[in-house]
Regions:
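Secretory-pathway/membrane protein signature
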Residues: 1-233
Length: 233
């Protein structure tokens, strides 16, 4: 059937890119090589085919994970230490609050809203778009836009290790830990500002213990993806 013919055509081209080019991170020569193959194929059916360059920061989007783990782990440790070093409670808790605010800012902006807030802190690369246009045979009434991506992604370990049964609880517990540590540091700072020493506050002690218990979860989340293993597909 015609549907099977087109499906086989798509499968053959995908297989060709995977075998001929292989793994291709965004902004690499391998990605461009794949795009050139696609451009040549598109020239057989389209009127205009162009390859346009643009700049990007390929490591920025997933960078919020490492940054968040560092900031929140440090904040949890500082909260814990404030109980044993009450004289340094203000700087410890103040820095801890600042770190969790920084972490939450990048989680919300980079991960939830796809804002490029981490781009200035990561390496810049040049990627490309393949733009193909097929002109109408008559009057233009509608435009159909089909888009995709030519690069291949880093391996998401959690997907292989356990699929949704591991991905969802790991991210969920990790985010609960981030929010709990943020609230704990802020509450502890308010208690200290109110005149209570961290050494005398059972609330600060309990909050610090719970926050520290989340640290193994934070470090486990660092294994979410493997930057050294890139997919072919």
């Amino acid at each position: 059937s015609e549907r099977r013919m087109y499906a086989n055509y798509v499968a053959r081209n995908i297989k060709n890119v995977c075998k001929t080019v292989g793994p291709r991170c965004a902004g690499t020569e391998k990605e461009l090589e794949a795009q050139k193959l696609m451009a040549e194929e598109l020239k057989t059916t389209c009127d205009d085919v162009n390859i346009e360059s643009f700049s990007l920061h390929p490591r920025a989007f997933m960078g919020w994970i490492q940054l968040t783990v560092f900031c929140v782990t440090a904040a949890a440790v500082m909260l814990f230490l404030s109980h044993f070093f009450p004289a340094a409670a203000y700087p410890l808790l103040g820095i801890g609050v600042a770190l969790v605010v920084i972490a939450l800012f990048f989680v919300i902006s980079e991960f939830l809203f796809y804002k490029e807030t981490l781009d200035p802190f990561t390496k810049k690369s040049t990627s490309h778009n393949v733009v193909a246009v097929r002109k109408p045979s008559g009057e233009t009434k509608r435009r159909i836009i089909v888009s995709g991506h030519a690069d291949s992604a880093m391996e998401w370990r959690f997907t292989y290790w356990g699929g949704p049964k591991l991905v969802v609880p790991s991210i969920g517990i990790g985010m609960i830990g981030v929010l709990f540590t943020a609230v704990a540091d802020i509450v502890a700072l308010i208690i200290v500002i109110g005149g209570t020493s961290p050494a005398d506050s059972k609330a600060i002690w309990v909050l610090s213990i719970i926050s520290v218990c989340f640290i193994p979860v934070f470090f486990f989340c660092l294994l979410f993806f493997d930057p050294k293993r890139i997919f072919e597909g």
